[in-house]
UniProtKB/Swiss-Prot annotation:
Localization terms from the record: Cytoplasm
Listed GO CC annotations: cytoplasm
UniProt GO BP: rRNA base methylation
Keywords: Cytoplasm, Methyltransferase, rRNA processing, S-adenosyl-L-methionine, Transferase
Predominant place of localization: cytoplasm
Top EC class, one word: transferase
Protein name in UniProt: Ribosomal RNA large subunit methyltransferase G
Reactions mediated catalytically: guanosine(1835) in 23S rRNA + S-adenosyl-L-methionine = N(2)-methylguanosine(1835) in 23S rRNA + S-adenosyl-L-homocysteine + H(+)
Length: 378
């Protein structure tokens, strides 16, 4: 938990999921402060759009202006809602939209936290292009090291004249004025053929490894079990290639695709519809924080390629939460399979949570682990 006085109001903010680390990561950064310093409340006219507000620092500060919080992270929405409540601000003060929704017309102010993925930034700038005017104040912010020439060129290409500020507390801002430059259309998804399958994989802008199959998933697919039945989960599904493979290998099983990214879940849905339409009725698609709210003892197996970062920050908090949720939602003798970088040492984490862990396969970079939910000892 951390405190920030941003000039609009004094806030106490925490990350989501919350951690008990001795040196916890902050729920806000200098770029949030720097963005807010640029605004005079008297100049805010028209809708306020906030993009990629990781834990709600901007939304909480500007809540009295009824901002729209736009992004591709359900975790960020949950974190923002929690911080609104914690600071005594009505959740209804902020309207949440995912990045593929229609943005409000003629915004007065647009604040953008520059996302990690340049493709997501381009998708969002193209969406803004449809609604902003020459009078819209457009300001983006990030750590100085995360603003590159390609970032500035993208703003110029999609929206118009762009300048950058001096660094302040290692943060930098981008100021942009909309001038309606000529711009060719771009497809909503990027597609590629998955070798040895005949499948075409479709990827929205914010999907991990959207330009091709990542090597961890490739290794995982080589070792997926067959002859499973009941309900199984592709947890943190991304574009759904693991779930697709499970559907093909296990015709008696139903697959639940889960991710905190609406773009990921929509990509998974599109990939099942396109490649295995006959299996669509065996699928469920869920935008969720891991398996929050899912009843215990529901699933026969969970498959997971857990992230070890949250936006720009390295952390295993999300993976740790995924493992705990998987154990709660597995039936007795249900199995959790994960693929991970070897250096993360998830073997001991799984053994601590499940009481057991086995190595299924390993190579010079990745390891596939299995843990089994055991019954209570008598």
């Amino acid at each position: 938990m951390s405190h920030v006085d941003d000039g609009f109001r004094s806030l106490t903010l925490k990350r989501f999921p919350q951690t008990d680390d001795v040196n916890p990561l902050l729920a806000w950064e200098a770029a949030d402060e720097y963005l807010l310093q640029q605004l005079d409340e008297t100049e805010i006219r028209g809708p306020v759009l906030i993009l990629n507000d990781t834990f709600g620092a901007l939304s909480c500060a500007l809540a009295e202006h009824s901002p729209y919080s736009i992004g591709d992270s359900y975790l960020s929405e949950l974190g923002t809602r929690e911080n609104l409540r914690h600071n005594g601000i009505a959740e209804s003060s902020v309207t949440f939209l995912d990045s593929t929704a229609d943005y409000p017309q003629a915004p007065g102010v647009v604040l953008i936290k520059v996302p990690k993925t340049l493709a997501l930034l381009e998708q969002q700038l193209r969406a803004l292009r449809k609604v902003v005017t020459a009078q819209t104040r457009i300001i983006a912010g990030a750590k100085a090291r995360d603003i590159h020439t390609s970032t500035l060129e993208l703003f110029e290409k999609v929206l118009g004249p762009t300048t950058t500020t001096l660094a302040w507390k290692k943060a930098r801002l981008i100021n942009c004025t909309f001038s309606h430059p000529q711009l060719a259309d771009a497809p909503q998804t990027l597609s590629w053929k998955l070798e040895d399958t005949g499948w075409t994989i479709h990827n929205h802008a914010n999907v991990f490894s959207r330009t091709g199959l990542d090597i961890g998933a490739r290794f995982f697919m080589q070792h997926l079990p067959e002859n499973l039945d009941g309900e199984i989960v592709d947890l943190g599904c991304g574009n759904g290639v693991i779930g697709l493979s499970l559907l093909a290998k296990n015709p008696q099983a139903n697959v639940v695709f889960v991710d905190e990214s609406p773009m990921a879940v929509d990509s998974s849905r599109l990939n099942v519809e396109t490649n295995l339409p006959e299996a669509f009725e065996r699928c469920e698609f869920m935008i969720n924080n891991a398996l929050s709210g899912v009843e215990p003892f529901r699933f026969n197996a969970v498959f997971c390629n857990p992230p070890f970062h949250q936006k720009h920050a390295l952390t295993d908090n999300i993976a740790w939460e995924m493992f705990h949720h998987a154990r709660r939602c597995l039936k007795i003798n249900g199995e959790l399979y994960i693929v991970a970088n070897r250096h993360l040492d998830y073997f001991h984490k799984l053994k601590k949570i499940f009481g057991n862990c086995a190595t299924i396969a390993t190579n010079n970079k990745f390891v596939i682990l299995k843990a089994v939910k055991q019954g209570r000892r008598r």
